[in-house]
Amino acid sequence: MAKERGLISPSDFAQLQKYMEYSTKKVSDVLKLFEDGEMAEYLQGDAIGYEGFQQFLKIYLEVDNVPDHLSQALFQSFQTGYYIEDTVREDVVCLSDVSCYFSLLEGGRPEDKLEFTFKLYDTDRNGILDSSEVDRIIIQMMRMAEYLDWDVSELRPILQEMMKEIDYDGSGSVSLAEWLRAGATTVPLLVLLGLEMTLKDNGQHMWRPKRFPRPVYCNLCESSIGLGKQGLSCNLCKYIVHDQCAMKALPCEVSTYAKSRKDIGVQSHVWVRGGCESGRCDRCQKKIRIYHSLVGLHCVWCHLEIHDDCLPAMGHECDCGLLRDHILPPSSIYPSVLASGQERKTSKISQKTMDDLSLSTSEALRIDPVSNTHPLLVFVNPKSGGKQGERVLWKFQYLLNPRQVFNLLKDGPEPGLRFFRDVPDYRILVCGGDGTVGWILESIDKANLPFVPPVAVLPLGTGNDLARCLRWGGGYEGQNLGKILKDLETSKVVHMDRWSVEVIPQQTEEKSDPVPFQIINNYFSIGVDASIAHRFHIMREKYPEKFNSRMKNKLWYFEFATSESIFSTCKKLEESLTVEICGKPLDLSNLSLEGIAVLNIPSTHGGSNLWGDTKRPHGDIHGINQALGATAKVITDPDILKTCVPDLSDKRLEVVGLEGAIEIGQIYTKLKNAGHRLAKCSEITFHTTKTLPMQIDGEPWMQTPCTIKITHRNQMPMLVGPPPRSSNFFGFLC
């Protein structure tokens, strides 16, 4: 049977990618062995035979035996013209084609992948794709769609129409320029041809080991998993099995997007047996006897729990339940190829330029959210807060559509931002520490989004000063995530100031540490607190095993603070620097300072308020001072500063002087209200004359003599949690 060049099956391609995930070899390493190494005997000019190709795969994939069907399919995909299977071992393939293909899979640019696939299907090498070559491309796309479980009965005419649209000049053939233009704008060619493979809903469960605090029953054999015994639970559908039953489990019921036009727009219930943790039916309000056998049903989208007998009364359509405002149901996500031709032409993606060519799986799907909802884009840093991050990740994968939840350790925030780029009225939830939040805000800056979404924070780990100021707390402690999502629905938007930091070093032989950030979200400081943080940072990098618990960290921090109070390494700081606020010098001559902090938010070091609470006495003078404090760009008058309240969005910074480590400790333990209020300003410049410790948002470094300019950069919409019943929060959040 003859087979055309390039038509490797999607399942073979998926298997190849799995091999590549575990391989540490690079194509360049293998090529050296063929060009002048032990594999040179297999080289015939620039070609290799089937045996040489098998050796290439064996070395590159680091496996002893590549399945014969896979190696033959790959070998045949690189052959020109037709072949007879009986004589496959006598044929050869071009080594440069093979190396180019695997290099692209390693991480080639999208435009390179597009150009390679064009040449792969241009079998007569005339620089255009004629009708027969386009037909072969459509065949491959159909096979890919079938592998992805799409409804292929409606797809062929859609693909034919799409391929006609690619022929922009109507010549009857497709040039390389037209192919690249289409791939860069409206058509997800790489996905449709199988070179991007994360679209597959493969029916596989996402298992995690779990010990059950109550009697549960295996979804497969229906026998009990003993109290306190370990079984496996699927993160996506809550299907539960014994360890030994996992291999025979039914496929996962969760499909994350619509695969047919008839499924777009209307979401159906997806019922899974068991998993009725509340023990009460949401239909009849009677008990579900979950302790006696595998009974009841739960919907993976609206999370309703019902008796088996109540199912006929439930209806077909699912409204996604209490969390509908946040959820993108599968009916709202569908392959962009299923959009009408006019929709593809007017797609916002088509406005992208060739310089921004980054079509990915996300852009192969279109999102049409349910009206009057605010879909939630969730970023999780699994490393934050010990194991908290991992638990939060799989909990959100169940509560929401898994395609809304992104693991930052895999590909960072960019895939999520691209996926949601054109979604109206969406929100972002960042699960991590202040550093993770800063990473997301910087990525939003770079993404040049048409709509900048408001950002909420689920704080993981310790510190979390920004989350404290935004009323999301100092750290997640296992609270009900559904309750947190309901709080998010009633949150308010505040536009938080962000500040640019420019460090201009003086000519000196001393070498400075790299500046950790160019943007301030929380605070900047010079002197004593930065010195303590820097010593802590250096010691933790040198001896990480000594910093493996919160209690140890606190003890080390206390030790460094104590030694700093004894040696006072930043004593008489005012002699080593000068400060200008909006071009005017700040007088420090009457003060003996060891540190200066510049605050954008009224929380540092895990909840310390260096600015202090603002008293609100009555009287005309107070009213005048308060009015001045709310409007002036520069304030240094002590009486007016007493009335100033920190504000995240007033485009001004608070400047505080610190006498030493003891004073910082007193503020931290609430024995002292605040440091010395020095100024409130919209721009500040430091000139230093010696090497000093500094920090931005908790990241310390040693800086040689320099000039530091801090200016307003922009504002970012942030979500403020609902007011607590009894609030001790400060400033405008009181």
Swiss-Prot record:
EC numbers, comma separated: 2.7.1.107, 2.7.1.93
Enzyme class: transferase
Binding site for Ca(2+) 1: 122, 124, 126, 133
GO cellular component: cytosol; plasma membrane
DAGKc domain location: 371-505
Gene3D superfamilies according to UniProt: 2.60.200.40, 3.30.60.20, Diacylglycerol kinase alpha (1.10.238.110), EF-hand (1.10.238.10), Probable inorganic polyphosphate/atp-NAD kinase, domain 1 (3.40.50.10330)
Activity modulation comment: Stimulated by calcium and phosphatidylserine.
Cell compartments where the protein resides: Cytoplasm, Cytosol
GO biological process, one term: phospholipase C-activating G protein-coupled receptor signaling pathway
Chemical reaction(s) catalysed: a 1,2-diacyl-sn-glycerol + ATP = a 1,2-diacyl-sn-glycero-3-phosphate + ADP + H(+); a 1-O-alkyl-sn-glycerol + ATP = a 1-O-alkyl-sn-glycero-3-phosphate + ADP + H(+); 1-O-alkyl-2-acyl-sn-glycerol + ATP = 1-O-alkyl-2-acyl-sn-glycero-3-phosphate + ADP + H(+); 1,2-dihexadecanoyl-sn-glycerol + ATP = 1,2-dihexadecanoyl-sn-glycero-3-phosphate + ADP + H(+)
Chain residues that bind Ca(2+) 2: 167, 169, 171, 173, 178
Domain EF-hand: 109-144, 154-189
Residues that bear N6-acetyllysine: 483
SMART domains: C1, DAGKa, DAGKc, EFh
Statement: the UniProt record of this protein carries the keyword Metal-binding: yes
Zn-finger (Phorbol-ester/DAG-type) residues: 204-252, 268-318
Superkingdom of this protein's organism: Eukaryota
Signal sequence interval, chain numbering: none
Summary of subunit composition and partner proteins: Monomer.
Function: Diacylglycerol kinase that converts diacylglycerol/DAG into phosphatidic acid/phosphatidate/PA and regulates the respective levels of these two bioactive lipids. Thereby, acts as a central switch between the signaling pathways activated by these second messengers with different cellular targets and opposite effects in numerous biological processes. Also plays an important role in the biosynthesis of complex lipids. Can also phosphorylate 1-alkyl-2-acylglycerol in vitro as efficiently as diacylglycerol provided it contains an arachidonoyl group.
PANTHER family: DIACYLGLYCEROL KINASE, DIACYLGLYCEROL KINASE ALPHA
Family label: Belongs to the eukaryotic diacylglycerol kinase family.
Name the record gives this protein: Diacylglycerol kinase alpha
